[in-house]
Amino acid sequence: FMKNWKLILAILTANVVLMAAGYTMLIPFLPMYLMNELGVSADDVKMWNGAIFSITFLIGGIMAPIWGKMADTRGKKMMAVRAGAGLALSYFLGGIVTTPEQMFGVRVLQGFAAGLWSACLAIATSLVPMEKLGVSLGIMQAGLTCGNVIGPLVGGSLATLFGMRASFFVAGALLTIITLVFMFYIPEPPKAEPQKLAAKPQVQLLQQPVIRETLVYIAVAQMVILLIQPILSLYVAELSHGDGNIMFLSGVAFSLVGVASAITA
């Protein structure tokens, strides 16, 4: 595996770009999708948009330790395929839903299917030589940022040109490609030698003040970053007074956030 680590890194990075683009390309027009396609009233759209947006992260956060444990016991490649297939299915379903309740259920499914990024990282750390691991993870992080930048712009453009439902199908197709690539081109990383761990190591880690403080800082930072995302499109519509191409402008606004993050990283 180590002889082909550059090819594996290239495939993983390309998958990360497609994954991030698929994640973010739907964000700019989700409020309009709820109102125009799913019949949500203007008075209720903020509530529905916030609930639909956040439920995926809630479920994903709860399931992350479980998927991580299964990756150690069942295999990292299997978890990557599971996440990719589940996300692809959820996006295809998102393109055919007709009610906000159905869309909420789709986002719940996305939460259960989360874990693709962590699976990519785990595979990279297992297959890339240790002396090249730092630069390899940096390249993958750059790919993640690139996908976050181009995703909203592509999603807003597709929604403008071909309709909002088309963007769901494109995202589903991208994630299907990722799943197939993992199935046929990424080898299963060798299992690490079992180590005797102390009882309840998570509890011991949380007893360290620096770990607790770091987790709090990360949680607050993520909360601030995600706070405006559910309402940014609605705010753009309010500023433009309903004139102009709201979905495209929202896509540009979200992409600029990614550009700023890349510059300051």
Task: Tell me what each language-model feature is.
Residues 2-5, 187-216:
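Juxtamembrane intracellular "pre-TM" segments in multi-pass secondary transporters
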Residues 4-32, 36, 210-227:
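Pair of pore-lining "gating" transmembrane helices in MFS-fold secondary transporters
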Residues 29-46, 231-248:
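Short amphipathic helix-loop junctions that connect adjacent transmembrane helices
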Residues 51-67, 255-264:
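Central cavity-lining transmembrane alpha-helices of secondary-active solute carriers
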Residues 62-98:
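Conserved MFS/SLC helix-loop-helix module at the cytosolic interface between two early adjacent transmembrane helices
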Residues 90, 101-109:
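Paired small-residue
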Residues 106-144:
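Cytoplasmic helix-loop-helix junction between adjacent transmembrane helices
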Residues 173-192:
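C-terminal membrane-cytosol helix-exit motif in multi-pass small-molecule transporters
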